[in-house]
A protein has these predicted regions:
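The substrate-binding groove and active-site-proximal loops of carbohydrate-active enzymes
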Residues: 48-57, 115-127, 172-176
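Active-site glycine- and acidic-residue-rich loops that bind
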Residues: 11-13, 127-131, 136-138, 170-179
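Polysaccharide-binding and catalytic clefts of secreted carbohydrate-active enzymes
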Residues: 118, 146-179
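Non-globular sequence segments
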Residues: 81-142
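Glycine-rich beta-alpha junction loops
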Residues: 3-6, 82-85, 149-153
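Short coil-to-beta-strand
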Residues: 28-38, 97-105, 144-157
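Short acidic/His/Gly/Ser-rich catalytic and metal-binding motifs that mark active-site loops
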Residues: 41-45, 88-89, 154-158, 162
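N-terminal capping/small domains of soluble enzymes
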Residues: 1-81, 90, 126, 134
């Protein structure tokens, strides 16, 4: 997947985004396309221009994107994500980004952000938001969903004992806590 940052407004699918996938899938050379990582809630947005799967109002635009890929004969999978400590919600300093452990993080653009240790309620909400995003993806007609858990984003932060210094059941000290 590529991160084109071609969404508009609050992460809505744009004509430019559709044009990008139309061009890339033209000719039917791809059996499967995994679209760029899309945020499951506003607190988990990794960059301006990232596609949203965080609201039911996103479904219509996502349907347009699915149709563009399906016209080429390709299957399409959505990649859903939460940026965790790398979230841009913290760039203006008014809030801190949610993360396994409160500590400084760096966004994908190199900006420093401060993160706070997620509460159990926040963890439960993120789990619910991933499930809701997957339902939206299904409603939009995608052929599958991939949960992004790499590149230092939230799930990867939980997997790493470097960024996960929790002392509860989500501890980064044990395999069980990280899974």
């Amino acid at each position: 997947p590529m991160a084109t940052e071609k969404s508009v407004g609050e992460g809505e699918v744009s004509e430019g985004l559709c044009d990008y996938y139309r061009e890339k899938t033209a000719g039917g050379y791809f059996g499967l396309v995994i679209t760029e990582h899309s945020y499951i809630n506003k607190e988990g947005q990794a960059s301006v221009g990232q596609v949203s799967v965080s609201c039911d109002t996103d479904i219509e635009g996502l349907k347009r994107l699915v149709e563009v890929v399906h016209v080429s004969g390709s299957k399409v999978i959505a990649q859903i994500n939460h940026a965790g400590g790398k979230a841009i919600c913290a760039l203006d300093g008014s809030v801190t980004a949610p993360a396994p452990t409160g500590m400084p993080y760096t966004t994908t653009r190199g900006e420093a952000v401060e993160a706070h240790t997620m509460s159990q309620a926040e963890i439960d909400q993120v789990i619910a938001d991933f499930a809701a995003a997957a339902r939206r993806v299904k409603a939009a007609g995608y052929d599958g969903v991939e949960i992004h858990s790499a590149h230092g984003y939230l799930l990867n932060q939980f997997y790493s004992p470097i960024s996960n210094r929790r002392e509860d059941s989500y501890t980064g000290e044990t395999i069980e806590g990280r899974t």
